[in-house]
């Protein structure tokens, strides 16, 4: 009976692992299209910008006995290669730099989140919000 249970367990684990590796349940870390809001305090408008950002699932591990060992570092989906594009906001006050730069993800990877260059927080309630009126019909890439 134990041999039959062991064989059944082996069969379930081997089939489940093969299926999971071919068809991930969640999309893996990759560049996706996104719309960002670009505005400055001394400029009267907000412009939406189409760009690519990094998003998706990164495999992580957690220790079973957390009190006994140090926690494992957790990874996030972050930029591997990135370039910065710029747009110029219209109607800014004199002396205010009207240029706003935004990231364009060329490739992504799973790695540690560096707070100096990335927003390491979770999902935002309102990712596209503007304090100033939104300029209609202008989308930049």
UniProtKB/Swiss-Prot annotation:
Intracellular or extracellular location(s): Secreted
Signal sequence, renumbered to the chain: 1-20
Entry keywords, A to Z: Disulfide bond, Glycoprotein, Hormone, Secreted, Signal
Main subcellular location of this protein, as a coarse class: secreted
Glycosylation sites: 33, 50
One term of GO molecular function: hormone activity
GO biological process: G protein-coupled receptor signaling pathway
One Pfam family per UniProt: Cys_knot
Subunit comment: Heterodimer of a common alpha chain and a unique beta chain which confers biological specificity to thyrotropin, lutropin, follitropin and gonadotropin.
Official protein name in the record: Lutropin subunit beta
Organism: Macaca fascicularis
């Amino acid at each position: 009976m134990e041999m039959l249970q062991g064989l059944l367990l082996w069969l379930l684990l081997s089939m489940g692992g093969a299926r999971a590796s071919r068809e991930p349940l969640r999309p893996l870390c990759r560049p996706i299209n996104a719309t960002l809001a670009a505005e400055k305090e001394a400029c009267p408008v907000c412009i939406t910008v189409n760009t690519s950002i990094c998003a998706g699932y990164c495999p992580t591990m957690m220790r079973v006995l957390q009190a006994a060992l140090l926690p494992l570092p957790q990874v996030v989906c972050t930029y591997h290669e990135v370039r910065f594009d710029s747009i110029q906001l219209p109607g800014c006050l004199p002396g205010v730099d009207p240029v706003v730069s935004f990231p364009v993800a060329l490739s992504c990877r799973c790695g540690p989140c560096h707070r100096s260059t990335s927003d390491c927080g979770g999902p935002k309630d309102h990712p596209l919000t503007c304090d100033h009126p939104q300029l209609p019909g202008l989308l930049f890439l």
